[in-house]
Regions:
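N-terminal carbohydrate-binding accessory modules
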Residues: 1-71
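Substrate-binding cleft and catalytic face of glycoside hydrolase catalytic domains
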Residues: 24-25, 61-169
Length: 169
């Protein structure tokens, strides 16, 4: 059987991806964190918790591993519930932490790619009807504007939604 030779263009991004809910730990009040606490939420009744402890600083270890394996990009998400825990409250220290992560990637020669929404919603947003609320686009646009404004100096690549069809179905 002949071997296939694949060529990738110069500048092709090799990397990996994460989701805030899956790696950060210390989960804020989101629809997923609430669901995970329900007895019927997970088959074996395990509960969400520390995850990979990125929020406590272990992201540095993973970024070092990405650098050691010559990755050139890393997609991470910003946890909306962490940045905007209540409709009229913004957590600036949380944005500072995400900024620190993006700086860490850039210092390692890794291009950050930020996903603004990776499946989870703030609990206040879910309690107001989530994406079925006619104000949902307004809420999300304000969140996105604030995050992009805070992080744009450290990130050139953005994804609005991870798997948007999950909500459409």
């Amino acid at each position: 059987m002949p071997k296939a030779i694949m060529y990738f263009p110069a500048g092709f991004l090799w990397g990996s991806a994460t989701a805030a809910y899956c790696v950060e730990g210390a989960s804020p009040a989101s629809d997923w964190s609430e669901w995970g606490q329900q007895p019927e939420g997970v088959l074996d009744e395990s509960k969400p918790g520390r995850a990979c402890e990125w929020w406590s600083g272990r992201w540095r270890e993973d970024f070092d591993r990405a650098q050691e394996t010559h990755q050139t990009a890393l997609r991470l998400s910003v946890e909306w519930a962490r940045v905007q825990p209540e409709p009229d409250r913004w957590d600036e220290p949380a944005l500072d932490r995400y900024r620190e992560m993006l700086i860490g990637l850039n210092q390692r020669g890794i291009s950050p790619l930020v996903c603004l929404h990776h499946n989870t919603n703030p609990l206040w947003f879910a309690n107001e009807g989530g994406w079925e609320n006619e104000q949902a686009p307004v809420y999300f646009a304000e969140y996105a504007r604030r995050v992009v404004e805070a992080l744009k100096a450290y990130c050139a690549l953005w994804v609005t939604f991870s798997a948007p069809n999950a909500y459409a179905l």
